[in-house]
């Protein structure tokens, strides 16, 4: 991840774009790029989307990468260790969604019995 972050920083800095990359603008960009990813699957069934993703891996990969690049940069400029944040969130989610209550169901944790 460190090498990827260094490449993202270099790409940005070589173009003097750091001035535009604040938390608000990066959050907006994440949302826009996520919408572009979502648009690829618009109006498809789950089965169609799975097939499309397999058949159009490069296109899907590019949109995922766009989201990830902005997300990694947002974590960087806000001083958030992304790997650590993910680990902490997984631990929190494990408590919200215990296996014995959530296995095989898509119910939100507030409605699990």
Regions found by a protein language model. Name each.
Residues 1-64, 68-113:
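Flexible "arm" and connector segments at domain edges
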């Amino acid at each position: 991840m460190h090498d990827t972050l260094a490449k993202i920083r270099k790409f940005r800095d070589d173009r003097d774009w750091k001035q535009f990359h604040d938390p608000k603008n990066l959050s907006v960009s994440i949302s826009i790029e996520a919408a572009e990813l979502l648009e690829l699957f618009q109006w498809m069934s789950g089965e169609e989307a799975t097939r499309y993703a397999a058949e159009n891996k490069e296109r899907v990969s590019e949109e995922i990468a766009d989201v990830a690049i902005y997300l990694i940069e947002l974590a960087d400029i806000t001083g958030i260790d992304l790997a650590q944040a993910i680990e902490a969130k997984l631990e929190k989610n494990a408590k919200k969604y215990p296996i014995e209550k959530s296995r095989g169901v898509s119910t939100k944790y507030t409605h699990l019995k």
